Regions:
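Conserved small/polar residues in nucleotide/adenosyl-binding loops
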Residues: 139-145
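Acidic (E/D-rich), amphipathic helical modules within compact regulatory domains
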Residues: 52
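Conserved beta-strand scaffold positions in the cores of enzyme catalytic domains, especially
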Residues: 106, 126-128
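N-terminal active-site segment of His-dependent metallophosphoesterases
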Residues: 1-49, 57-75, 80, 140
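Active-site environment of divalent metal-dependent phosphoester hydrolases
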Residues: 12-16, 35-39, 56-62, 85-90, ...
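Proline-aspartate-enriched helix->loop->beta-strand connector
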Residues: 102-104
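Non-DNA-binding regulatory cores of transcription-related proteins
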Residues: 93, 97-100
Length: 149
């Protein structure tokens, strides 16, 4: 089983509770609006980190992250982006990526609202972990060792 910590919208602040959970995770996914490269440094010290940049992120952060990430974790394809739009309509960039890549899980941020929803039209589990800055919200995701197709 893979334990994944999903966070977004830290805006330059990383709570000690988030770092505690990050240490226990096999992977940390940050869905953008990192706010300060120090957040990436702190998370990278304690766990395997994958992150995308958000709309507030500096050139420095954008130089070491991408707008989108596609991860394969235990046979699950995970699409990570910052701004996705409202399911099942999405913005054009995300909708085109979903149609091309067929992810199982979409992790996104931006709204600061923790939300987990199943997009039945595109067969995608959509997860917005909320804002891990102030106040703190986050999501844990545990994937089985191997996906059975």
């Amino acid at each position: 089983m893979k334990k994944i910590l999903l966070i977004s919208d830290t805006h330059g602040y990383i709570d000690s509770m988030i770092l505690k959970y990050a240490k226990k995770a096999d992977l940390v996914i940050h869905a953008g609006d990192i706010g300060d490269v120090k957040v990436l440094d702190e998370l990278s010290k304690v766990s395997n980190l994958r992150a995308v940049y958000g709309n507030i992120d500096s050139t420095e952060i954008r130089s070491c992250t991408n707008e989108n990430e596609f991860l394969n974790v235990e046979g699950f394809k995970i699409f990570v982006t910052h701004i996705a739009g409202k399911q099942p309509y999405y913005n054009n960039r995300v909708r085109n990526s979903i149609k091309k890549e067929y992810p199982d899980i979409l992790v996104y941020g931006h709204s600061h609202i923790l939300k987990i929803d199943n997009d039945k039209k595109h067969n995608v589990l959509c997860i917005n972990p909320g804002a891990a800055g102030r106040p703190v919200s986050y999501t844990h995701l545990t994937l089985p060792t191997k996906r059975i197709v």
